[in-house]
Amino acid sequence: MIQYPEPLAKLIESYTKLPGIGQKTATRLAFYTLSMQEDDVTNFAKSLLSAKRDLHNCSICGNITEDDPCPICRDKTRDHSQILVVEQSQDVMAMERMHEYHGLYHVLHGVISPVAGTGPEDINITSLLKRLKKDDEVKEIIIATNASSDGELTAGYLAKLIKPAGIKVTRLAHGLSVGADIDYADEMTLFKAVQGRTEM
Amino acid sequence: MIQYPEPLAKLIESYTKLPGIGQKTATRLAFYTLSMQEDDVTNFAKSLLSAKRDLHNCSICGNITEDDPCPICRDKTRDHSQILVVEQSQDVMAMERMHEYHGLYHVLHGVISPVAGTGPEDINITSLLKRLKKDDEVKEIIIATNASSDGELTAGYLAKLIKPAGIKVTRLAHGLSVGADIDYADEMTLFKAVQGRTEM
């Protein structure tokens, strides 16, 4: 039986290493690559290498950055008294798209998860504590881990750890999404919405 | 608002150029790339460049190949009296996986499509006719374009063109898939199955 030519087989193999891409999709993508403009393919290859080579985690907040410290940590106009703690770099971008938060961030790169065997020492908590010790400007830690059980566990762990230092610890509100129908909301979300109701 | 660091933004842009990959998936893939082994990323970049640089269409059959002519056209043990005509290189691999066809191939790189404005001169037909003129070893052309309306149109066009030269032209059988239920088959497939019924 004839096999795919080696360069094509290797490209298919590379595509299958991406999440959610199986043999069929990888083959389709590889053939598509052959039909792409030469420039686009060259830029694709360059951007793969450059992303891997030029991006690092900020030594202060752990967010992905080209320069260390990252532009957010360096920005004197931002409110350095607030640190918002997120699970991953993508969450920083989600918060920034909101345009309404002007404090700093801290990226945990994971959550405490007994099921996955991830303990507090496996995520970026030590550097958060170091930050708080070094910098007494910080007045509030806003915990923005996801509303999953692991996210809640991590939030609880952090609160217990930080509160004794006299720093205010808050958690993002849970409740109905804006525009959501009550009869489509799940029980946990409804429970959180009732629990966190506000006076009008 | 903070933007993604440039190397990451460029990588996301490259991923969005692939078919079926939007902004969200591209972002997910780009972040995943950052977490990949350095070697895997380097190999990915290399295979992109190599696939684009080292692969060409065989000057005889049009199939994708590293060497020209391709291994199938060069293979003296294959039956050079049969040419199976397909729409795209992927179809050659599908036929080869069957292990039962030992003739040659011809890849059209498309079909005649009045809707898309693709005429006979836009696909790899001229080189097929040249092949037939030069090589009187060919006894049969098996047309294996898809069973779509464009595929049927192309098949009809080729048959009309080749038959006068005294070469046998055949078409792959259409009918029920092996293992298919009759009550789930569409009308056209059932019609083709009845039309092409064989004596037992």
From Swiss-Prot, chains A, B:
Keywords: DNA damage, DNA recombination, DNA repair, Metal-binding, Zinc, Zinc-finger. InterPro entries: DNA_Rcmb_RecR (IPR000093), Rcmb_RecR (IPR023627), Rcmb_RecR_Znf (IPR015967), TOPRIM_dom (IPR006171), TOPRIM_RecR (IPR034137). One of its GO terms (molecular function) is zinc ion binding. PROSITE patterns: RECR (PS01300), TOPRIM (PS50880). A zinc finger (C4-type) spans 58-73. GO terms for biological process: DNA recombination; DNA repair. SMART domains: TOPRIM. NCBIfam families: recR. May play a role in DNA repair. It seems to be involved in an RecBC-independent recombinational process of DNA repair. It may act with RecF and RecO. This is Recombination protein RecR. The gene is recR.
